[in-house]
Amino acid sequence: GARGFDAALVHRAVGRGSQSSGRIARNGTFFQALLQLGLGWSSLFFRFNGQKGVFERVLDDVRVSGVSLPAINSLIEEMLQYGTNMRRVRTFVNDNPARSTGLSALTTFSGAAAAIIYTLEKHIARSSGHAVSLLQIKALFQRPGELIGALANILSAVELAATDAEIISTVFGKVAYLCQKFAWMESVLYEVAVCVAKPWLKFVEAWVGLCPETPMLIDQ
């Protein structure tokens, strides 16, 4: 069982002259820390480095009983990336509220990202009670992690844009690329693209007389 596996790891570490086979944490405590990490929150085992803008381990040699350090490290690396992406997108949303007076395309992108974060948080909170193993935690975060990673990818490019037109063009280009890479999220990403372009399209419609004039057009 798990204890026999742990004993074998200790024996092998001693035989190789290693000081430790890893510190064993309680399953429940460590699993909860992984869940918090995936959602972009610091915990007993993981913390956010504000200077580097990434999540890091508090201790490098923590594992759970029955699992070797190399095996658990692979999952931890994935979760560190998920948490870093989630924190980055959430910070962007908080810094660019949906009712901001800035660029309209940036505002609508922020609103779409906020809705996705809220939905994913609800899904993970609802399903986390059934995640009682490392494999289940990995499965729980696989698609949410990919989706938040896609948003972070779009965000990296959007932050370099200076106008609504540049933002819209960037989002559509990124969405087309990401939909080829992750076919399952196509409908979600296209919805994001539509949300980003909608204010600009309404402005164009008003400009050509297809709908009532907007305050923005009247001011001009």
Residue ranges and their predicted role:
Residues 1-220:
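Soluble, amphipathic alpha-helical scaffold/repeat regions
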